[in-house]
Amino acid sequence: TSNGFAVLMPDIVYKMDDPGMSALWAVLPAVDAAVKTGVVDANKMGLHGHSWGGYQTSFLITQTNRFKAAAAGAPLTNMISMYDLIYWNSGGGNMSIFEASQGRFLGGPWENWDAYERNSPIYHVKNVQTPLLMLHNDKDGAVDFTQGIEYYNALRRLKKPVILVQYLGENHGLGKLENRKDYAVRMLEFFNHHLKGMAAPVWMEKGVPRLKLGDHLNERAF
């Protein structure tokens, strides 16, 4: 453990046409097994993932309330809109990701609409009850920034507990050391609050105005 947290990394066994549901079917039994060891408090569990793991995190919280808090980095949230976007880091399209790679879909959305919709977090967003910390950067060249914005705006519209963190100019991950340190501390503060009952820092309670973001980051520099 580190900082009082035990970490579980479950293996996901995938079924075609159900990348999101497959995560649900794999993660929940793994969590049940972890709880049975006595190491894990079933009432104080968090969930975290980035990129494809961010997608799975965003999807899981639309299907279960088992987790008290979740953090998702650069998540795919709408399989249908993402399908036709560009993977800017390579310059190619996203279609192959969905039909021949991680998506594991049998065809495109126009011939397999129900599967794409069923496995897209955005279409189940009304079910979310879990507080979410979402990281998505404006220059993400793998998962388009609009994916994070779609999910964030829907959650906000429905008055769901969500915080969006963005590091200007960063890509799919965090390249700058100061940003990696900053986000690591924010994520720890987020989980400390929701899982350990520690006081929420000001940035979580009041947010940070876009025009004051630079000053805020300088004040928190590590």
Listing of model-derived features with the role each one plays in the protein:
Residues 1-222:
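Active-site-proximal cap/loop segments of hydrolase catalytic domains
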